[in-house]
Amino acid sequence: LHFTDPRFWIWLYQMEHEIRQNIPIMYYNIWDDLPDPLYNTNFYRSSDMLMSISKQTYGINKRILSKYGYEDWQTKYVPHGITDRRISKIEEKGDTKFKEFEAQYGLDKYKFKILYLNRNIRRKLPGDVALAYKHMMDKLTPEQRKECVFVWHSAPSDENGTDMKAVCKTLLPDYPVIFTYDNGGSMNDEQMNYLYNSCDVYINLASNEGFGLGSCEMLHAGGVIVVNVTGGLQDQCGFKNEKGE
Protein backbone atom coordinates (compact mmCIF):
# COMPACT_ATOMS: atom_id res chain seq x y z
CA LEU A 1 0.00 0.00 0.00
CA HIS A 2 1.37 3.42 -0.94
CA PHE A 3 -0.06 6.93 -1.05
CA THR A 4 0.56 10.62 -1.97
CA ASP A 5 1.61 11.93 -5.41
CA PRO A 6 2.69 9.24 -7.90
CA ARG A 7 5.88 11.12 -8.78
CA PHE A 8 7.33 9.98 -5.44
CA TRP A 9 6.85 6.33 -6.42
CA ILE A 10 8.37 6.12 -9.90
CA TRP A 11 11.09 3.82 -8.52
CA LEU A 12 8.33 1.44 -7.36
CA TYR A 13 6.50 1.52 -10.68
CA GLN A 14 9.70 0.73 -12.54
CA MET A 15 9.76 -2.70 -10.90
CA GLU A 16 6.00 -3.27 -10.57
CA HIS A 17 6.08 -6.27 -12.93
CA GLU A 18 8.42 -8.19 -10.65
CA ILE A 19 6.60 -7.16 -7.46
CA ARG A 20 3.08 -7.97 -8.67
CA GLN A 21 3.96 -11.54 -9.50
CA ASN A 22 3.94 -12.21 -5.75
CA ILE A 23 2.54 -9.12 -3.99
CA PRO A 24 -0.43 -6.93 -5.07
CA ILE A 25 0.17 -3.17 -5.14
CA MET A 26 -2.56 -0.89 -3.74
CA TYR A 27 -2.59 2.88 -4.11
CA TYR A 28 -4.51 5.21 -1.75
CA ASN A 29 -4.64 8.26 -3.99
CA ILE A 30 -6.08 11.71 -4.52
CA TRP A 31 -6.01 14.27 -7.31
CA ASP A 32 -6.95 17.91 -6.81
CA ASP A 33 -8.65 19.01 -9.98
CA LEU A 34 -9.83 18.38 -13.54
CA PRO A 35 -9.07 17.72 -16.37
CA ASP A 36 -8.23 14.05 -15.88
CA PRO A 37 -4.44 13.64 -15.45
CA LEU A 38 -3.89 11.29 -18.38
CA TYR A 39 -0.14 11.55 -17.80
CA ASN A 40 -0.73 9.48 -14.64
CA THR A 41 -2.26 6.60 -16.61
CA ASN A 42 0.75 4.28 -16.47
CA PHE A 43 1.25 5.09 -12.79
CA TYR A 44 -2.35 4.07 -12.06
CA ARG A 45 -1.98 0.92 -14.16
CA SER A 46 1.00 -0.10 -12.04
CA SER A 47 -1.39 -0.85 -9.14
CA ASP A 48 -3.82 -3.73 -8.70
CA MET A 49 -6.28 -1.61 -6.72
CA LEU A 50 -6.82 2.15 -6.41
CA MET A 51 -8.62 3.60 -3.40
CA SER A 52 -9.77 7.20 -3.85
CA ILE A 53 -9.91 9.74 -1.02
CA SER A 54 -12.41 12.01 -2.84
CA LYS A 55 -15.34 11.33 -5.18
CA GLN A 56 -13.63 13.42 -7.85
CA THR A 57 -10.55 11.18 -7.66
CA TYR A 58 -12.78 8.11 -7.84
CA GLY A 59 -14.28 9.43 -11.07
CA ILE A 60 -10.82 10.15 -12.47
CA ASN A 61 -9.59 6.63 -11.66
CA LYS A 62 -12.69 5.02 -13.18
CA ARG A 63 -12.56 7.04 -16.40
CA ILE A 64 -8.85 6.53 -16.99
CA LEU A 65 -8.77 2.82 -16.16
CA SER A 66 -12.07 1.74 -17.74
CA LYS A 67 -10.43 1.06 -21.10
CA TYR A 68 -7.81 -1.19 -19.51
CA GLY A 69 -10.16 -3.84 -18.15
CA TYR A 70 -10.16 -2.79 -14.49
CA GLU A 71 -13.12 -4.28 -12.60
CA ASP A 72 -15.33 -2.42 -10.11
CA TRP A 73 -13.59 -3.90 -7.07
CA GLN A 74 -10.27 -2.46 -8.26
CA THR A 75 -11.40 1.17 -7.83
CA LYS A 76 -13.03 2.17 -4.55
CA TYR A 77 -14.06 5.41 -2.82
CA VAL A 78 -12.45 5.44 0.66
CA PRO A 79 -12.66 8.97 2.15
CA HIS A 80 -10.78 10.24 5.18
CA GLY A 81 -12.54 9.60 8.47
CA ILE A 82 -12.85 11.79 11.57
CA THR A 83 -13.17 10.10 14.95
CA ASP A 84 -15.34 11.43 17.78
CA ARG A 85 -12.49 10.61 20.14
CA ARG A 86 -10.48 13.42 18.56
CA ILE A 87 -12.90 16.03 17.19
CA SER A 88 -16.46 16.59 18.44
CA LYS A 89 -18.85 19.37 19.30
CA ILE A 90 -18.45 20.71 22.84
CA GLU A 91 -21.93 21.28 24.23
CA GLU A 92 -20.83 22.82 27.54
CA LYS A 93 -18.40 25.65 26.80
CA GLY A 94 -18.30 26.72 30.42
CA ASP A 95 -15.79 23.94 31.04
CA THR A 96 -12.78 25.26 32.95
CA LYS A 97 -10.15 23.77 30.60
CA PHE A 98 -11.94 25.16 27.54
CA LYS A 99 -12.13 28.63 29.05
CA GLU A 100 -8.46 28.46 30.05
CA PHE A 101 -7.57 27.53 26.47
CA GLU A 102 -9.47 30.51 25.07
CA ALA A 103 -7.83 32.84 27.58
CA GLN A 104 -4.36 31.50 26.75
CA TYR A 105 -4.70 32.45 23.08
CA GLY A 106 -6.80 35.60 23.59
CA LEU A 107 -9.82 34.01 21.92
CA ASP A 108 -12.08 34.93 24.84
CA LYS A 109 -11.93 38.61 23.86
CA TYR A 110 -13.95 38.14 20.66
CA LYS A 111 -17.46 37.03 19.73
CA PHE A 112 -16.85 36.14 16.07
CA LYS A 113 -13.72 34.20 15.16
CA ILE A 114 -12.64 33.27 11.60
CA LEU A 115 -10.21 30.35 11.44
CA TYR A 116 -7.49 29.72 8.87
CA LEU A 117 -6.06 26.25 9.43
CA ASN A 118 -4.11 25.13 6.38
CA ARG A 119 -0.52 24.94 5.29
CA ASN A 120 0.96 28.29 4.42
CA ILE A 121 1.51 27.53 0.72
CA ARG A 122 0.56 29.44 -2.39
CA ARG A 123 -2.30 27.23 -3.62
CA LYS A 124 -4.06 27.72 -0.26
CA LEU A 125 -4.22 31.46 -1.09
CA PRO A 126 -3.55 32.74 2.45
CA GLY A 127 -3.21 36.34 1.28
CA ASP A 128 -6.62 36.14 -0.39
CA VAL A 129 -8.14 34.97 2.90
CA ALA A 130 -6.63 37.98 4.68
CA LEU A 131 -8.00 40.26 1.95
CA ALA A 132 -11.47 38.70 2.30
CA TYR A 133 -11.28 39.36 6.05
CA LYS A 134 -10.38 43.00 5.33
CA HIS A 135 -13.34 43.44 2.96
CA MET A 136 -15.69 41.98 5.58
CA MET A 137 -14.32 44.21 8.34
CA ASP A 138 -14.51 47.30 6.13
CA LYS A 139 -18.28 46.83 5.93
CA LEU A 140 -18.81 46.60 9.69
CA THR A 141 -19.33 49.35 12.22
CA PRO A 142 -16.45 50.21 14.58
CA GLU A 143 -18.28 48.45 17.43
CA GLN A 144 -18.81 45.29 15.37
CA ARG A 145 -15.13 45.21 14.35
CA LYS A 146 -14.08 45.02 17.99
CA GLU A 147 -15.92 41.70 18.28
CA CYS A 148 -14.25 39.99 15.28
CA VAL A 149 -10.83 38.39 14.85
CA PHE A 150 -8.90 36.46 12.21
CA VAL A 151 -7.31 33.35 13.79
CA TRP A 152 -4.23 32.07 11.98
CA HIS A 153 -3.23 28.53 12.99
CA SER A 154 -0.32 27.76 10.67
CA ALA A 155 3.30 28.77 10.25
CA PRO A 156 3.27 32.58 9.92
CA SER A 157 5.97 32.34 7.24
CA ASP A 158 6.97 29.54 4.87
CA GLU A 159 9.41 29.36 1.97
CA ASN A 160 6.62 27.77 -0.09
CA GLY A 161 4.05 30.33 0.97
CA THR A 162 3.65 33.85 2.29
CA ASP A 163 5.02 36.01 5.09
CA MET A 164 1.61 36.48 6.67
CA LYS A 165 2.81 38.73 9.47
CA ALA A 166 4.09 41.18 6.87
CA VAL A 167 0.86 40.84 4.87
CA CYS A 168 -1.35 41.44 7.89
CA LYS A 169 0.78 44.34 9.12
CA THR A 170 0.39 46.03 5.73
CA LEU A 171 -3.14 44.97 4.81
CA LEU A 172 -4.80 44.82 8.24
CA PRO A 173 -3.03 47.39 10.43
CA ASP A 174 -6.22 48.25 12.33
CA TYR A 175 -7.88 44.83 12.47
CA PRO A 176 -7.11 42.09 15.02
CA VAL A 177 -5.26 38.92 14.02
CA ILE A 178 -4.25 36.08 16.36
CA PHE A 179 -1.20 34.04 15.34
CA THR A 180 -1.48 30.94 17.51
CA TYR A 181 2.14 29.95 16.83
CA ASP A 182 3.20 32.99 18.86
CA ASN A 183 1.93 31.11 21.88
CA GLY A 184 3.28 27.57 21.70
CA GLY A 185 3.21 26.38 18.09
CA SER A 186 1.38 23.19 17.15
CA MET A 187 -1.42 21.80 19.34
CA ASN A 188 -2.35 18.36 20.65
CA ASP A 189 -5.70 16.71 19.85
CA GLU A 190 -7.51 18.21 22.83
CA GLN A 191 -6.32 21.72 21.99
CA MET A 192 -7.26 21.27 18.33
CA ASN A 193 -10.78 20.31 19.38
CA TYR A 194 -10.94 23.40 21.58
CA LEU A 195 -9.75 25.57 18.68
CA TYR A 196 -12.43 24.30 16.30
CA ASN A 197 -15.11 24.73 18.95
CA SER A 198 -13.95 28.22 19.87
CA CYS A 199 -14.07 29.53 16.30
CA ASP A 200 -17.29 30.33 14.44
CA VAL A 201 -16.29 29.79 10.83
CA TYR A 202 -13.50 27.98 9.00
CA ILE A 203 -12.36 29.33 5.62
CA ASN A 204 -10.48 27.52 2.84
CA LEU A 205 -10.13 29.37 -0.47
CA ALA A 206 -7.54 26.95 -1.94
CA SER A 207 -7.43 26.98 -5.73
CA ASN A 208 -6.98 23.18 -5.68
CA GLU A 209 -7.72 20.94 -2.71
CA GLY A 210 -7.38 17.18 -2.47
CA PHE A 211 -9.75 16.57 0.44
CA GLY A 212 -9.73 19.36 3.02
CA LEU A 213 -9.28 17.72 6.43
CA GLY A 214 -9.56 21.02 8.29
CA SER A 215 -12.99 21.86 6.92
CA CYS A 216 -14.20 18.30 7.54
CA GLU A 217 -13.02 18.50 11.15
CA MET A 218 -14.74 21.88 11.57
CA LEU A 219 -18.02 20.33 10.39
CA HIS A 220 -17.47 17.48 12.84
CA ALA A 221 -17.16 20.08 15.62
CA GLY A 222 -20.49 21.61 14.56
CA GLY A 223 -18.95 24.68 12.92
CA VAL A 224 -19.54 26.54 9.67
CA ILE A 225 -17.23 26.33 6.63
CA VAL A 226 -16.62 28.67 3.70
CA VAL A 227 -14.83 26.79 0.90
CA ASN A 228 -14.15 26.80 -2.82
CA VAL A 229 -15.97 24.19 -4.89
CA THR A 230 -12.90 22.18 -5.84
CA GLY A 231 -11.53 18.67 -5.33
CA GLY A 232 -12.61 16.84 -2.20
CA LEU A 233 -14.14 20.00 -0.72
CA GLN A 234 -17.13 19.26 -2.95
CA ASP A 235 -17.78 16.08 -0.94
CA GLN A 236 -18.36 18.21 2.18
CA CYS A 237 -20.79 20.71 0.65
CA GLY A 238 -23.81 18.39 0.44
CA PHE A 239 -24.23 18.69 -3.31
CA LYS A 240 -26.54 16.12 -4.93
CA ASN A 241 -27.15 15.16 -8.56
CA GLU A 242 -30.53 14.96 -10.29
CA LYS A 243 -31.06 11.55 -8.67
CA GLY A 244 -30.55 13.01 -5.22
CA GLU A 245 -27.32 11.09 -4.76
Residue ranges and their predicted role:
Residues L1-M49, K55-Q56:
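Extended catalytic core of nucleotide-activated donor transferases of GT-like folds
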Residues S207:
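Aromatic "clamp/platform" in nucleotide-sugar-dependent glycosyltransferases that forms part
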Residues A103, L107-K124, Y133, F150-V151:
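Conserved donor-binding/catalytic core segment of Leloir-type glycosyltransferases
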Residues V224-V227, G238, G244:
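Short hydrophobic beta-strand element within catalytic cores of glycosyltransferases
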Residues P35-Y77, I82-E92, T162, A166:
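A short, active-site helix/loop in glycosyltransferases that binds the activated sugar's phosphate group
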Residues E18-I19, G161-E190, Y194, K243:
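Nucleotide-activated donor-binding/catalytic signature segment of Leloir-type glycosyltransferases, i.e.
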